[in-house]
Amino acid sequence: MADFVKLSIFGTVFEVTTRYVDLQPVGMGAFGLVCSANDQLTSTSVAIKKIMKPFSTPVLSKRTYRELKLLKHIRHENIISLSDIFISPLEDIYFVTELLGTDLHRLLTSRPLEKQFIQYFLYQILRGLKYVHSAGVVHRDLKPSNILVNENCDLKICDFGLARIQDPQMTGYVSTRYYRAPEIMLTWQKYDVAVDVWSAGCIFAEMLEGKPLFPGKDHVNQFSIITELLGTPPDEVIKTICSENTLRFVQSLPKRERVPFSQKFKNADPMALDLLEKMLVFDPRTRISAAEALAHPYLAPYHDPTDEPEAEEAFDWSFNDADLPVDTWKVMMYSEILDFHNIDNSGQDEGPVPPVNN
């Protein structure tokens, strides 16, 4: 059994193994607190994310299990990687990942980005998306604060807690409004990997302009702002709307013409706008894919088809429709953690695996 130390950070108890020292708070999310720390075993800086009460409800247990499975499966230079995971004596779960110095949200609020940085950041976002999409995974909550950057401008996508299987009948969810694809608001249940490309397009526009492109106050205002730039949705999109209330709302909006992107983004590179227009398309069926976007001339300085890998195998989503009690999720989680550490059930684990109360 590993030794643990208990700390209070922002009024939250952090229980970590003695391997990690010098903890400092770096961020607080809806589902956990993140601290930086020094890993004495590897002499590197790491980020430690505490999952708050992972076994409090079946929904939260499943969400935590999903994120753990994804982090174990996804191995790519532009996706955050898991270096350690452990369960504390209080049965909280801690994910340990590499530490990057900042995120895109902080960069965008501090200063305008130069052209070469915009290109390089967009290239890396799309390179990461190509990989996860090839594994049958949709991130679903891509936004600047979920895109980490280090001092070398290396970029990694993080926070896969909302990620889901690529499925044409996806269930509705709550993501960050500014970056939400219109098909989520219009059809709610029918969307796929194209939603991430829309989000990446919104982030691309924000890098070009230095401010959010579609800062809606609520979902109605959000959709209205989108139509101010893209015009009224085409008939092919309106036909996909299942909800009568949504259909009435869309039909009640004034008819709007598309605004030329060169008029909206007066100082932008024409090649950048050509790619942006292909990413911000109302109809997800005609929206450019991440793989196609990588080959666009705007990204030619970085594009290398021999170094833009796809996943070797699709992610196993067989657990995703399971409606299981907390104790079952707990056992499954312990099994995944043991597997991560390459320890079988008869071995001696370095971290605690508390008994499950049946």
UniProtKB/Swiss-Prot annotation:
Regulation: Activated by tyrosine and threonine phosphorylation.
A GO cellular-component term linked to this record: nucleus
Cofactor(s) this protein cannot do without: Mg(2+)
Residues where ATP binds: 26-34, 49
Residue(s) carrying Phosphotyrosine: 173
Family: Belongs to the protein kinase superfamily. Ser/Thr protein kinase family. MAP kinase subfamily. HOG1 sub-subfamily.
General function of this protein: Proline-directed serine/threonine-protein kinase involved in a signal transduction pathway that is activated by changes in the osmolarity of the extracellular environment. Controls osmotic regulation of transcription of target genes.
Name of the protein in question: Mitogen-activated protein kinase HOG1
Lineage start: Eukaryota, Fungi, Dikarya, Basidiomycota, Ustilaginomycotina
Gene from which the chain derives: HOG1
